[in-house]
Structures are given as C-alpha cells and as structure tokens.
C-alpha cells in the first residue's frame, strides 16, 4: 500500500517502495482553473529537491511544479500531452504528473500528512 504525502507547494506524493508518483493537489488545480497545457520533465532527468520540474498552464496563470525530493524521473504521464484537463478532473489520481525514484528517504520526513495539509489549506 502506498503512503501519501503533501508539500506546502500543493503537490501530492504517493510513495510505493522506491518510486514516488507526483502531482498537484485538488486544491491547487481549483486555484489554477482549467488547465490548457502541461510541460513535464523528460524521463531520465535528475532532479534536486526544490527544482522547478514541470509547468502547469491554465487560463489564469502558468505555475511551476517543484521536485519534492531528490531523485530521477522514471516515467511521465503521457496522457497529459493531449488531455491536460485530466489534472482538473482527477488531480490526485489519473492526473499525476511524473514518477521518480527516491534517493534519500529522510527527505520524506519534512513532508505533510493529509491532516497537516488540510490544516494548511484551511
């Protein structure tokens, strides 16, 4: 079973073993409005925590999505190239952005659990 974490930048992470699936939260997609474009990192890209890894563009604004951990991108959500609205429809499921390996599991300790994230967004 996967463990779910959140960041203060409104990203969610689903951790299964050494692979982490990353996306933006439902709250974030609601704030952005209808997405029209998603620019994802390439598979094989090495990311450091805090790097701008992707861009989600909506009718309102373009926003960076940051790497929540150090690691390497192992898969991207190809469906978003033609259907960025998946992020609006199912942000925390089929609207995931990329999957990456975890290099340093201690970085998970600084992330929020669901209760802490709900407190953050009020």
From Swiss-Prot:
Binds 1 lipoyl cofactor covalently. Keywords: Lipoyl. Its cofactor is (R)-lipoate. The keyword Glycoprotein does not apply. The modification N6-lipoyllysine is found at residue 60. GO terms for cellular component: cytosol; glycine cleavage complex. Residues 19-101 form the Lipoyl-binding domain. NCBIfam families: gcvH, PRK01202.1. Belongs to the GcvH family. This is Glycine cleavage system H protein. It comes from Bartonella quintana (strain Toulouse) (Rochalimaea quintana). The gene is gcvH.
């Amino acid at each position: 079973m996967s463990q779910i974490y959140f960041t203060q930048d409104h990203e969610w992470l689903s951790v299964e073993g050494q692979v982490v699936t990353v996306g933006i939260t439902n709250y974030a997609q609601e704030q952005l409005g209808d997405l029209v474009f998603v620019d994802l990192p390439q598979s094989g890209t090495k990311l450091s925590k805090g790097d701008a890894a992707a861009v989600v563009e909506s009718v309102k604004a373009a926003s960076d999505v940051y790497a929540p951990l150090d690691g390497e991108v192992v898969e991207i959500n190809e469906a978003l190239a033609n259907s960025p609205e998946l992020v609006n429809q199912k942000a925390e499921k089929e609207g995931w952005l990329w999957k990456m390996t975890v290099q340093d599991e201690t970085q998970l300790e600084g992330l929020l659990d669901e209760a802490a994230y709900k407190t953050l967004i009020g």
